[in-house]
Each structure stands twice: as structure tokens, then as C-alpha cells.
From Swiss-Prot:
Name this protein carries in UniProt: Eukaryotic translation initiation factor 3 subunit C
GO molecular function, one term: translation initiation factor binding
Organism of derivation: Drosophila ananassae
Comp. bias intervals (Low complexity): 195-209, 894-906
Function: Component of the eukaryotic translation initiation factor 3 (eIF-3) complex, which is involved in protein synthesis of a specialized repertoire of mRNAs and, together with other initiation factors, stimulates binding of mRNA and methionyl-tRNAi to the 40S ribosome. The eIF-3 complex specifically targets and initiates translation of a subset of mRNAs involved in cell proliferation.
BP GO terms, sorted: formation of cytoplasmic translation initiation complex
Pfam families: eIF-3c_N, PCI
All residue ranges annotated as the PCI domain in the record: 641-817
Main location: cytoplasm
Biased composition annotated in UniProt, kind: Acidic residues: 11-20, 162-186, 211-237
Length: 906
């Protein structure tokens, strides 16, 4: 029979049956398969086999690229490897309980070694092409960043790189044979026990050895068992079309294979993950990552545990500190175990304190990069250990812990105890780590709120250190810990302070202002370093300004002379100074000191970079204005989000203060060519708005202030107040103030007063006299207030007028020129300046081209006159022009005097 028929029998009856069946099939089912194709067992592979095969293929590709140093392709293959591992994570977490396969760790270790080898070869790097060099740097950064999550696995692998676990052998076997399990029956038989071989031979025909002749099909030894023939014929009858042949078949052998693999894997996992409490002897250890790591033994079984032995073990553990291949997590675990052993054998509190301090140092050392924040589990552990150590120190006052105690002078056995260490440095580092954690979080997320809740524990730890140093510490240490306490307190608003001012609570109630006074005054008296004292003064001023103690804050600024030497301070202190000035300006604004508020804020706002000056963010810079290292340093100096000052509030207060000062000044010096600008920023905003041909309704905060300024120039206080105090501005700005209603009332009052002053400056030349009650009614002010404002203007010689008390009127003197006269005088001044400039240009063009030595010789004069023109006539013209200019000036002065006399007579 032909080999293309489904059944390989020589029987004519079977062949006729096949022909009858073939006539009933459609064209799609008419395709038949050869005997070789029937022998191939089609099996759908599991997801694990697919994922692992993909990983191994990429790893082989990476190794090939490393051999020829093809770095760009190595980079692309590494990216493919990370993506493939990400896809395989669900399988790994399900099948391996999250244990990273050893072959994957081996690949990462080899890749890291390859990169380090190429990177350290400086001569070889110089010979690399531009593409290879660029790819090497990118690959190095990506690999170093990626392997951070596999540090523990890599460290264990490097300790025993040649050790192969049973799990890796099984994975390697599955990776190499998983894809060919259905094609090679011998491979499947080899993985089975010897007893299962006969059954497999019955169900799966063995593949014969290859023969030299072409008729190898005829030499196949078929089993003559009738059951096998029946089964094979039944199998052939089952597949009536192509689709059914490719559906997965689950044989009895495969089911047994799967069951045995699962049982073996379960036994292995149970052996690895067995808990100590499940064993009677308690000798089993929990292994985190896949294979057993033997922990170093602390002491011998029959060793006598005493203080020297524990200290020797402590020195042994800490001697590995900072070394390259030190397992930092294991080091922390060993220290905790040593602490427990010390407590079990009652070796004393001093030994426990020393071990606590070394645990704190080990936790700090876990993160090698100082600029990066520590992990959250380490942070929680650090807080717990720190507070535990400080409580031990407070309960046992006979323990003296100081960095001045040398190692050989430590006393841990008898009281008084002396322990080497510095809890102050530890709590300062703890505070810095807390700030890093806050900066790392998104300020608008719940993580930031969760981290911010830890500030309670940080402040509690600082309080414990403060109590310890108040009992046992020098002035320098107390000043340092007081400053840490101040830095957590100075920016927080305490409503009890204002209630105490109003008498709503007893006067003996201690508020945050009282605490700040006590801490800062101690630093003022005892500190011998300028930095701590300066920062304490700045924080003290900030806290006073936040609680509206304007005069105390102002006096501290003036008496300390901070503004004279702040430029020599460190960047962190300068940032605190900028924050203090910003808050002082807000305080002055709330206390109705508009001019002082403007003076405090002008230096911050005129630069256009208040965000950077207050360390609340970085502005986008041009390409070469800031290097990457400078940007990194500036980011480290940024303030946490909860300490930020609202920049829009700050700018609005500055612009409103500038408006209240600038608009009356512009109206008073409208025709003064030499008038100065009070606020350059506000003046630019006003001029840019005036240059626009079409101005729409205001939308932003700046547009509202500019529109209010235009209304104030006309004396329209109601429109001005509506632009400044409205629903949109309340939401953006004014509601951010404590007691915002009082601030809005203060703003409305100032707008009325400055609008009145602007009105009098602008229209004083129109009125002969004006009624004070009419002005009071127009601006909704008390008559006494209007009288006071006008009196001040007259005294300061801003308004040329006099008050007539019987009639309650203001009589204008009209001593100032009218608008037309002022414009005419400006025109005369400009024409005079133009004439002077033209005369100077004329003199420069004429020059002196004759020799001064021959001026007395008439012949030479005649020669010069004939050759270059009449120079004598030119001199006469110059004298005549100068005489005319002097006469015009005298006439102009006489005319002005006559005008003044005429005005006085009228």
C-alpha cells in the first residue's frame, strides 16, 4: 500500500474501507499523512515551558553577543530579556512561589561581570566605536538599576556560583526537552522509571534506528498484539478531519509524568520551606530564595556566654561593615540575634544599648547611595530600634553614651557604664532620612500622607534625645538637638496663640510661641557657632510672623542684622532666610503695613524666580545654564511639599501692595519726567496691558490686579474692590489666610483710601474747592478719616490746598500748572535739549583743521580762508547762536515768573 494512507496495513479489506471513507470527506479532509508524521506526538506545551524556553533562548543570544562584544545587540537583547521575565512573572509566582530561577540569576551575574570587565578596560573603551561606547553606558546604567531587585539572589549566587539545586536541574531538563517531548519518544522513556517502560512501549511505538537503505519503512517491527492494533485502528477512525489531529491528547503516560513531577516539586518545596516549629528538634531554617543558605553560627553549643564573648562576636560582625560582598541583610539579622542572646543571658543593659546602636548603624549602611531614600521596612525598623535604645538610656541614667568615649575605655560590666556612640548623630541622620522619604513621594498621593504621619514618631524620637541630653549633655549637643526640635515646629500654625491674645484661653496656657521662645533663647545664650544661632533666629522670626507678632518679628530682624551677612551663609540657611522674608511680608500685609510688605517681598519677586529661591521646585532652564550635577544638588535642597508657601498668594500680595503704592504715586507725578518706579514688575504688567488693543474680562490673578489698578487710576474704588475681592479671587488667594474676612475688610478699606488720594491728585486742577462730606459720601468713609487723609497730603506737600473748617471744604491753591501748561513746559524742555544736542554735533563736525601756531599770520589766515572756507565767519556764527540761546532761556524764565504772579493775583 502507499505510505500516504492513514493505516499502514496490507489488508485489502482495510484499504477498501479507507477508500469508501475517503469518498465521503470534503476536499479539506482529503489530505492524509505519512507514517513518519503519524509517529510525531503533537502536545500543547504548558505556559511555563513556553516562558522558560523564551528566556533561555534570549540568554543564549546574549551570551553569543557577549562573545563577539556586540554591545548594541546585547542591549536590545537585555531589554527583550526583561520584558520576557515580566511576562513570566505570573508563572514564576504560581509555580515557583516567587523564587527567581537560578539560570536567570546566573545570566544577570554574568552580564554584570561582562559590563564591569569592559568598563574597567580603559584602553579597550577608547577603541570602541561611537555606537558601542554609547550602548555600553546605557547598558551599564540599565543593568545596575535592574539588578537592585535581585541583590540578595545575586549575593547568594556569587557565594556558590557552581552549586546547582535540584530545581535548576529540573528546569534545565524541561527547557532542553520540553519542546521535543512529543517528538522524541526515547526522551520521554528516559525520564520514566524502569517499571513504566513496557506500558510506554505498548502505547507509543518506538522509533527504529535509521537504516542505510531507502526501504527503512518495511523493516519496522510492529507489535502483533491485537489490542494494540485495535487501539491504533480506533485512533485512526477518530480523526476524520485535520483539526481533530492537532487537538491535544492526554495519554496515561503523560498523566503519570505530570503527577510525578508535581509530587517531586511539592516534596522539594516542603523541604525548603519547612518551618522551625514543624520540627521537634528545631534545627530547620527558613530559606527565603529557593536554596538553603547556612547561617553562620553565633557561638558553640557548649560555649559560656559572657560579655567579652558577645563583644568579640559583635566586633566580628561589624568588621564586615562597608566591604564589597557583605550581605547587609544577614548582618542586621545577626545583630538582632546577638541582641536576643544578650538579653537571654542577662548581660546587662549597657551591652544591649551598644548592640542597639550597632543595629542602627547597620540599617543606615544598608542603603549604599546616600542620596536615595531607604526602604520602608528599614525605616519602620529604624524607628523601632531607635526609640527602644533611647528608652533604655532614659530608664538607666547610669549609662553614659558619648562619641568621646574611646573603644578601650568602654565600661559595660559595672556601673557607671560608658558606651561609645552618638545618639545625636543618629537622630540627625534619622531626620534627614525622613525628609528624603517625603521628597521621594508624590505630594498629591496617599503615600505622602502616610509618610507624613511618621513625623509624630520622628518628633517623639527627638523629644527622647532631648530629654537624655538635658540630663546628660553639654551645651553644644543641647543646641543641636534644640535646633532639630525647632525645625519641626517653626512652620506650624498654632491657633491657640491667637486665642490667647484675645483672652479666650487662660494666659498660663503654653503655646508653640512659648516653646520657641524657650528653645531659641537658650541657643542665643549658649551657642558658639554662627550657623545654629542664625537658623534659630530665622525660625524664630518665621514663627512670630506666622502668628501676627509683627513688631517682635521686625525687631528681631533689625537687631540681628541678618540682611548684612546672609550672603556668606550656606545655601540651606539662605533658603530659610528667603522663607522668613516671604512670611514676614505676608504678616506685614495682614497687619496693614502695606509698604513694609512690599519691601519684604520685592527682592523675591523682582527676580522672577521665587520658586527656586524658596526651594519649592526648579524652573526649566536652557541647555547649558545648569549641569546635571547642579540640578541633582538643587533637588536635594528642595523643601518637602507640606512646608511650601503658596506662590500665587505671595505674588498676589506683592502685586496688590505695589498697586496701592504705585497708582497714587503715578497720579501725583504724572508730568514728572524724572519720576522713579516703585515696583518694576507691577509697572511692566500695567504697561503691557495698556499696549493691548483689545482687553477682555480678567481671568488670571494678575489680570484681576491690573484691571483693579486701571479702575483705581480713575478713582473708581467700587470697580477696583470688585476686581480684587470676588468669588474667584477668594478661592484662589484670600481664603488661604487665617481669618480671611478680616483681610478682605482691610483690603476694601485701603482701596477706598488710596482711591481717594488718587482722585485728589488727578482732578485737583479741575476743582476750585471741594466738600469733605461729599468726598466721604463718594468713598463711603467717615468724615474724620477723609479729613485726616487730606491733612496728611497737605502736610507732606503732596496737595497744594488748604482746609476751611467752618465750611468743611478743601480750597485748591492752583499753584501747580494745568495740564496744558505742564505739557507745554515738557515740550520746551525737550526742544531745549534737542538744540543742545544739535550744537554739540555741529561743533564736532566743524573741527579745528588749522595750525594754532600760524593763527597770527594774516597770510596763513587768508590761505586757510581761500582753501577751507571762512573760519572767522564760522566762529562769529557760533557765538551768535550761543547768545541767542541764552536770551531764549532768560525770556522763558521771565514768562514763567509772570505766569506764577498772574495765578497768585487771581
Amino acid at each position: 500500500m502507499s505510505r500516504f494512507f492513514a493505516n499502514g496495513s496490507d489488508s485489502e479489506s482495510e484499504s477498501s474501507e479507507e477508500e469508501v471513507q475517503a469518498t465521503n470527506f470534503n476536499k479539506a479532509s482529503a489530505f492524509q499523512f505519512s507514517d513518519d508524521e503519524e509517529e510525531v506526538k503533537r502536545v500543547v506545551r504548558s505556559t511555563k515551558e513556553k516562558r522558560y524556553e523564551n528566556l533561555t533562548n534570549i540568554i543564549k543570544t546574549i551570551r553569543n553577543h557577549k562573545k563577539i562584544k556586540d554591545i548594541p545587540n546585547t542591549l536590545s537583547s537585555f531589554e527583550d530579556l526583561t520584558k520576557a521575565y515580566t511576562k513570566a512573572l505570573p508563572v514564576i509566582s504560581k509555580e515557583e512561589n516567587g523564587i527567581t530561577p537560578r539560570f536567570y540569576i546566573r545570566c544577570l551575574a554574568e552580564l554584570e561581570d561582562f559590563i564591569n570587565e569592559v568598563w574597567e578596560d580603559r584602553e579597550g573603551r577608547k577603541n570602541l566605536s561611537k555606537n558601542n561606547s554609547k550602548s555600553l553606558g546605557t547598558l551599564r546604567q540599565k543593568v545596575r538599576k535592574y539588578i537592585k531587585d535581585f541583590e540578595d539572589d545575586l549575593s547568594r549566587f556569587r557565594e556558590a556560583p557552581d552549586q546547582e539545586s535540584e530545581a535548576e536541574d529540573e528546569e534545565a531538563a524541561q527547557d532542553s526537552d520540553g519542546g521535543d517531548a512529543g517528538d522524541d519518544s526515547d526522551a520521554g522513556i528516559k525520564r520514566e522509571p524502569a517499571e513504566a517502560a513496557p506500558k510506554v512501549a505498548k502505547t507509543v511505538p518506538a522509533k527504529a534506528a535509521p537504516a542505510d537503505d531507502d526501504d527503512s519503512d518495511d523493516s519496522i517491527d510492529w507489535d502483533s498484539d491485537s489490542e494494540t492494533e485495535t487501539e491504533s485502528s480506533d485512533d485512526e477512525n477518530q480523526y476524520q478531519n485535520m483539526r481533530e489531529r492537532f487537538l491535544k491528547r492526554t495519554t496515561e503516560k503523560e498523566e503519570k509524568d505530570d503527577d510525578k513531577r508535581k509530587d517531586k516539586r511539592k516534596e522539594q518545596k516542603i523541604k525548603i520551606r519547612k518551618r522551625p516549629e514543624d520540627d521537634e528538634d528545631g534545627e530547620w531554617e527558613t530559606v527565603v530564595k529557593g536554596h538553603v543558605v547556612e547561617k553562620p553560627k553565633m557561638f558553640e553549643k557548649d560555649a559560656e556566654i559572657d560579655i567579652p564573648l558577645v563583644l568579640a562576636k559583635l566586633v566580628e560582625i561589624m568588621s564586615a561593615r562597608g566591604k564589597k560582598r557583605t550581605d547587609r541583610r544577614l548582618q542586621i539579622d545577626l545583630l538582632f540575634e546577638l541582641r536576643d542572646i544578650s538579653d537571654q543571658h542577662n548581660l546587662g543593659t549597657a551591652v544591649s544599648v551598644k548592640i542597639h546602636f550597632n543595629i542602627i548603624s547597620a540599617i543606615f549602611d544598608y542603603n549604599q547611595k546616600i542620596s536615595e531614600p531607604m526602604k520602608l521596612e528599614h525605616w519602620a525598623l529604624l524607628l523601632e530600634v531607635m526609640q527602644s535604645m533611647l528608652k533604655l538610656l532614659l530608664v538607666n541614667p547610669d549609662i553614659h553614651m558619648s562619641e568621646s568615649v574611646a573603644e578601650e575605655h568602654e565600661e559595660l560590666a559595672t556601673s557607671p557604664f560608658y558606651v561609645r556612640g552618638c545618639p545625636l548623630a543618629a537622630v540627625e541622620r534619622l531626620d534627614d532620612e525622613f525628609t528624603k522619604l517625603l521628597k521621594e513621594c508624590d505630594p498629591h498621593s496617599n503615600d505622602y500622607v502616610s509618610r507624613l504621619k511618621d513625623e509624630v514618631n520622628v518628633v517623639k524620637t527627638i523629644e527622647l534625645v532631648l530629654q537624655y541630653f538635658e540630663n546628660d549633655g553639654n551645651n553644644n549637643e543641647r543646641c543641636r538637638i534644640y535646633l532639630r526640635k525647632i525645625e519641626h515646629l517653626y512652620y506650624k500654625f498654632d491657633p491657640e496663640v491667637l486665642k490667647k491674645k484675645r483672652g479666650e484661653i487662660p494666659q498660663n496656657t503654653q503655646t508653640s510661641v512659648d516653646v520657641m521662645d524657650r528653645l531659641c533663647k537658650f541657643i542665643y545664650a549658649k551657642d558658639d557657632t554662627d550657623r545654629i544661632r542664625t537658623r534659630a533666629i530665622l525660625a524664630h522670626i518665621y514663627h512670630h510672623a506666622m502668628h501676627d507678632n509683627w513688631f517682635q518679628a521686625r525687631d528681631l530682624v533689625l537687631m540681628s542684622h541678618l540682611q548684612d551677612n546672609i550672603d556668606a551663609a550656606d545655601p540651606a540657611t539662605r533658603i530659610l532666610y528667603n522663607r522668613m522674608m516671604a512670611n514676614l511680608g505676608l504678616c506685614a500685609f495682614r497687619q496693614e503695613n502695606i509698604k513694609d510688605a512690599h519691601h519684604c517681598l520685592v527682592d523675591l519677586m523682582v527676580t522672577g524666580k521665587p520658586k527656586e529661591l524658596l526651594a519649592q521646585g526648579l524652573l526649566p532652564q536652557r541647555q547649558h545654564e545648569r549641569s546635571a550635577e547642579q540640578e541633582k544638588i538643587e533637588k536635594q535642597r528642595q523643601m518637602p511639599f507640606h512646608m511650601h508657601i503658596n506662590l500665587e498668594l505671595l505674588e498676589c500680595v506683592y502685586l496688590v501692595s505695589a498697586m496701592l503704592l504705585e497708582i497714587p504715586y503715578i497720579a501725583a507725578h504724572e508730568f514728572d519726567a524724572r519720576r522713579r518706579m516703585i515696583s518694576k514688575t507691577f509697572y511692566q504688567q500695567l504697561r503691557s496691558s495698556e499696549r493691548q488693543s483689545l482687553v477682555g474680562p480678567p481671568e488670571s490673578m494678575r489680570e484681576h490686579v491690573v484691571a483693579a489698578a486701571k479702575a483705581m487710576r480713575c478713582g473708581n474704588w467700587q470697580a477696583c474692590a470688585n476686581f480684587i475681592v470676588n468669588k474667584k479671587m477668594n478661592t484662589k488667594v484670600w481664603d488661604l489666610f487665617y481669618e480671611s474676612d478680616r483681610v478682605r475688610e482691610m483690603l476694601t478699606k485701603f482701596i477706598k483710601e488710596e482711591s481717594l488720594r488718587t482722585y485728589l491728585f488727578t482732578y485737583s486742577n479741575v476743582y476750585t474747592s471741594i466738600s469733605i462730606p461729599s468726598l466721604a459720601q463718594m468713598y463711603e468713609l467717615p468724615v474724620q478719616k477723609v479729613h485726616s487723609i487730606i491733612s496728611k497730603m497737605i502736610i507732606n506737600e503732596e496737595l497744594m490746598a488748604s482746609l476751611d473748617d467752618p465750611t468743611e471744604t478743601v480750597v485748591m491753591h492752583r499753584s501747580e500748572p494745568s495740564r496744558l501748561q505742564a505739557l507745554a513746559m515738557q515740550f520746551v524742555d525737550k526742544v531745549t535739549n534737542l538744540v543742545d544736542v544739535n550744537e554739540k554735533v555741529f561743533d564736532m563736525k566743524q573741527g579745528n583743521f588749522f595750525q594754532r601756531g600760524n593763527m597770527g599770520n594774516r597770510g596763513d589766515r587768508g590761505y586757510n580762508r581761500n582753501q577751507d572756507g571762512n573760519w572767522g565767519g564760522q566762529l562769529r556764527d557760533i557765538k551768535r547762536i550761543r547768545g541767542q540761546r541764552i536770551q531764549r532761556g532768560r525770556k522763558h524764565q521771565q514768562q514763567q515768573q509772570q505766569q506764577v504772579q498772574t495765578i497768585d493775583e487771581e
